[in-house]
Regions:
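Short internal beta-strands
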Residues: 42, 63-72
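Phosphate- and divalent-cation-binding pockets in alpha/beta enzyme and binding domains
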Residues: 49, 57, 75-77
């Protein structure tokens, strides 16, 4: 398993051939432009954990990725296009 800190709350987890991005927020930019993601996880709706301005481009660039987020983020950020998790 490889865990890469991409700034503030954002991490990239790589394990068993899978790439999972966690909390791509607005206080880090190094996640922008990432591709080949298998999953995107947003733990909660604060902007430092999900950047509402740029998340749509990330989701579009990783159309095959599973996207999961806290329920409030799912409702407040339509570009996230995520299924809610508890």
């Amino acid at each position: 398993m490889r865990i890469t800190h991409l700034g503030h709350s954002c991490i990239l987890v790589e394990a068993a051939g899978q790439r999972i991005l966690v909390d791509p927020g607005n206080l880090s930019k190094s996640w922008r432009g990432l591709t080949d993601l298998d999953a995107i996880l947003v733990t909660h709706r604060h902007p430092d954990h999900v950047d509402p301005e740029h998340i749509g481009a990330l989701v579009d660039a990783n159309s095959g990725a599973v996207v999961r987020a806290e329920e409030g983020a799912c409702h407040e950020i339509p570009a996230l296009d995520a299924d809610p998790v508890a």
